[in-house]
Regions:
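Extended recognition/assembly regions associated with phosphoester-bond processing machinery
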Residues: 1-236
């Protein structure tokens, strides 16, 4: 599906639940995860666990429930897809000591999510030195077939990355809607942040132009019930 095909008709007719990158088709989950069914591989990005406690240490008080909320959402998406492998695509922890602030219950929750499956932590800019005591394996990037998984996008073909926390705003039927989104041109993709407090960056930011030339990409917005594919040129 091309961006040109997406700009005709009503926004409500542009609904998709699949994203194709370098001829590999992924299920785009409303949670912000991608699932590669053939590989039984689930990918999530930018969990930013313990962001609330990180802010609290600097005097910015947020409700201290982001980690439990994020892990709960992750448990739900794992239950839906039953992956053989999970890749956490960097910035899983908000800072270098965030893992030390996990409660015993949160550590048990992580162990439960890892049970019976392979788990890969990709290092990110927030967590370049990932802990070795939380199970799973640690890598800077992982290549499977034509797809390379890394945290920071380079614009390479076959790349799935995170880091930028894409979101998009669109108007339809007199209403404005801003949502997290996958950004993809079919050759590469940037995933939305999964974490409860992760926030987002507009796809109209110059950072995306470096990855997707001429705005020739699609924003796959996470709606209430399904994913909506909308040409980036229609977003603001």
């Amino acid at each position: 599906m091309t961006a040109g095909a997406l700009v005709s008709g009503d926004v409500e007719d542009m609904r998709v639940s699949r994203v194709t990158i370098s001829d590999v088709t992924f299920a785009a989950d409303l949670s912000g995860a991608l699932f590669w069914e053939e590989q039984r591989l689930l990918v999530v990005s930018d969990l930013h666990l313990e962001k609330g406690s990180s802010f609290a240490s600097r005097g910015v008080l947020l409700p201290p429930y982001d980690t439990i909320a994020t892990l709960g959402r992750l448990a739900a998406v794992i239950s839906r897809h039953d992956p053989r492998t999970v890749i956490a695509l960097g910035d899983s922890f908000h800072d270098r000591t965030a893992h030390e602030r996990l409660s015993a219950e949160d550590r048990d929750a992580v162990a439960g999510l890892q049970s019976g499956r392979d788990w890969i932590w990709i290092s990110g800019n927030h967590d370049p030195m990932l802990p070795r005591d939380l199970g799973g394996t640690v890598a800077d990037e992982v290549a499977i077939g034509p797809i390379t998984f890394r945290h920071e996008p380079t614009g390479a073909h076959g790349e799935i990355a995170g880091h930028l926390h894409p979101k998009a705003r669109v108007s339809a039927r007199g209403r404005s809607m801003e949502r997290r989104c996958f950004a993809s041109d079919g050759m590469r993709a940037v995933m939305p942040a999964f974490g409860a407090y992760a926030g987002g960056l507009s796809i109209r930011d110059a950072a995306f132009a470096k990855i997707f030339p001429k705005n020739g990409f699609v924003a796959h917005l996470l709606g209430d019930r399904r994913v909506h594919a909308i040409a980036a040129s229609r977003c603001y």
